[in-house]
């Protein structure tokens, strides 16, 4: 077995199949498992997906939200066990794969049309 096939076989077992399909422009609720000392809790991070990158086990996505007037972006590995679950709140209609232009927009200008 070649190295490439071996790596593919190992990573295939690590991929998660319980995640919903989502695209840039969608609004997600990401339930993240946070461990503080001996305690474990779930924190919900809700925002708009501004990018997805990579493939296979190394795929990541970035979610952006506005928290008390400050833009917060958080990048998550897609197949990490730290993500409890992902809920798609809204499906957004955008014509770009990377929504970096949302960083400069404020208020109503930063809205994304919803797919009906």
From Swiss-Prot:
<dbReference type="GO" id="GO:0022625">
    <property type="term" value="C:cytosolic large ribosomal subunit"/>
</dbReference>
<keyword id="KW-0687">Ribonucleoprotein</keyword>
<keyword id="KW-0689">Ribosomal protein</keyword>
<protein>
    <recommendedName>
        <fullName>Large ribosomal subunit protein bL19</fullName>
    </recommendedName>
</protein>
<dbReference type="InterPro" id="IPR008991">
    <property type="entry name" value="Translation_prot_SH3-like_sf"/>
</dbReference>
<dbReference type="Pfam" id="PF01245">
    <property type="entry name" value="Ribosomal_L19"/>
</dbReference>
<dbReference type="InterPro" id="IPR018257">
    <property type="entry name" value="Ribosomal_bL19_CS"/>
</dbReference>
<comment type="similarity">
    <text>Belongs to the bacterial ribosomal protein bL19 family.</text>
</comment>
<comment type="function">
    <text>This protein is located at the 30S-50S ribosomal subunit interface and may play a role in the structure and function of the aminoacyl-tRNA binding site.</text>
</comment>
<dbReference type="GO" id="GO:0006412">
    <property type="term" value="P:translation"/>
</dbReference>
<dbReference type="GO" id="GO:0003735">
    <property type="term" value="F:structural constituent of ribosome"/>
</dbReference>
<dbReference type="InterPro" id="IPR038657">
    <property type="entry name" value="Ribosomal_bL19_sf"/>
</dbReference>
<dbReference type="InterPro" id="IPR001857">
    <property type="entry name" value="Ribosomal_bL19"/>
</dbReference>
């Amino acid at each position: 077995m070649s190295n490439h096939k071996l790596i593919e076989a190992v990573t295939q077992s690590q991929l998660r199949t319980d995640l919903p399909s989502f695209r840039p422009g969608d609004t997600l609720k990401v339930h993240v498992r946070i461990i503080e000392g001996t305690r474990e809790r779930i924190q919900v991070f809700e925002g708009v997906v501004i990018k997805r990158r990579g493939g296979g086990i190394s795929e990541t996505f970035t979610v952006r939200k506005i928290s008390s007037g400050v833009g917060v972006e958080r990048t998550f590995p897609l197949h990490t066990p730290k993500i409890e679950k992902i809920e798609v709140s809204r499906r957004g209609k955008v014509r770009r794969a990377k929504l970096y232009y949302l960083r400069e927009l404020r208020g109503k200008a930063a809205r994304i049309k919803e797919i009906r």
